[in-house]
Regions:
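Catalytic beta/alpha-barrel core
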Residues: 170-180, 196-202, 224
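Metal-associated gating/positioning segment near the N- to mid-region
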Residues: 1-42
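Glycine-enriched alpha-helix->loop->beta-strand junction motifs that scaffold or abut catalytic
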Residues: 127-134, 166-169, 186-195, 216-221, ...
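C-terminal cap of metal-dependent C-N hydrolases
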Residues: 289-331
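Metal-coordinating catalytic core of metallo-dependent amide/deamination hydrolases
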Residues: 35-180
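Divalent metal-coordination and catalytic microenvironments
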Residues: 22, 50, 108, 138, ...
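Histidine/acidic-residue-rich catalytic or RNA/ligand-binding cores of hydrolases
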Residues: 69, 143-155, 183-188, 205-214, ...
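His/Asp/Glu-enriched, well-ordered alpha-helical/loop segment
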Residues: 163-166, 212-301, 317
Length: 331
């Protein structure tokens, strides 16, 4: 069992590593729940850790009800169990009032179509939109989930969401490793976001998402560190592109309208991440919060960089060693 005190210590370590790697905001996909509905110990452990480290956080509180399509929870899943939807919303609304609004927000998670029925996912999407909260959901990370969803519902998980909930720029599908082209096209056209986690997806041998079609359609895709086995935003950025090179046998898949890989990947790690978490960050401009990362341009890994080549050298050849510090809310 994992209790609040060791959870807090683990979060402090994790969030500290995030800041050291240049990450200024964490969207914590949080589904360790509590002994009773009035117990906020696990939530507070995560929030207190973020406060101690000084990282901005959106606590994405997960609803988790089933152990699979038509199955009860069992074993280790029992700790993730959510009570009824009404109690869950009361918990979230109370937590939203208690958090430090300058650095902390609350969002929602419907864990997956296998852990939450589509009617409940629809209600969560509606409630999140009404509250101005971002909503995330695991989707099509592994082929088995798709096959079982088709057996249960006759359609893929993405098709189930496209037709079953109100998709908006406040809704993010995490992974989409094996999403069909037509389903992805509809999701992006409806305004939905995608979050990829290249290092975790590689670690778990999940597969590689088709970024080519997402880029071609101009979809909003962000990056997550997921399992945190290795925390490096520069590596996540790099492998978003490199994985495509390996599968498509071509370079420059993840590029902007001007053919720049660096500009595209930097936007993915900043502006797009901000949109997926519903935060006014991600760029240095009037009206945005002063969150940014300082890079040592004289580091040996960036030796010889010019204004024109710095971005590419950062994305292709640098690691956490070039990160000097992170500035969050000007501090």
């Amino acid at each position: 069992k994992l209790f609040s005190k060791p959870l807090r210590a683990l979060c402090v370590q994790c969030f500290s590593e995030m800041r050291q790697s240049g990450i200024t905001t964490v969207g914590e996909f949080h589904y360790f729940h509590h002994d009773k509905e009035t117990d906020f110990a696990m939530d507070r452990a995560v929030l207190e850790a973020a406060s101690e480290v000084g990282i901005r956080i959106v606590l994405l509180h997960a609803f988790y009800k089933h152990g699979g399509f038509g199955k009860q929870l069992g074993g280790g899943q029992l700790r993730f169990s959510t009570q009824d939807l009404e109690t869950w919303w009361k918990h979230i609304d109370q937590l939203s009032v208690e958090v430090d609004g300058s650095m902390q927000r609350v969002g929602t998670v419907a864990h997956s179509v296998r852990a939450v029925d589509i009617e409940t996912i629809r209600d969560i999407a509606i409630g999140s939109l009404q509250r101005g909260m971002p909503m995330h959901i695991h989707l099509e990370e592994q082929r088995q989930e798709i096959e079982k969803c088709i057996q249960a519902h006759g359609v893929t998980p993405m098709a189930l969401l496209n037709d079953g909930i109100e998709v908006s720029p406040m809704v993010t599908a995490v992974h989409c490793t094996h999403t069909a082209a037509a389903d992805m096209e509809q999701w992006l056209a409806l305004g939905g976001n995608v979050c990829l986690c290249p290092l975790t997806e590689a670690n778990l041998a999940d597969g590689v998402s088709n970024m080519h079609r997402i880029v071609k359609q101009g979809g909003c895709v962000s990056l997550g560190s997921d399992s945190n086995a290795r925390i490096s935003m520069l590596e996540e950025m790099r492998w978003m592109e490199y994985a495509q090179r390996l599968t498509r046998e071509e370079r420059g898949v993840c590029v902007d309208n001007f053919g720049s890989m660096a500009n595209y990947l930097i936007d993915v790690a900043t502006k797009n991440g901000a949109r997926c978490l519903g935060l006014p960050v991600g760029e240095i401009s009037i009206g945005k919060l002063a969150d940014f990362t300082v890079v040592d341009i004289e580091h040996s890994q960036l030796s010889g960089a010019t204004p024109e080549t710095l971005g590419d050298m950062l994305c292709c050849g640098a690691d956490n060693a070039v990160i000097v510090r992170t500035i969050i809310s000007g501090n």
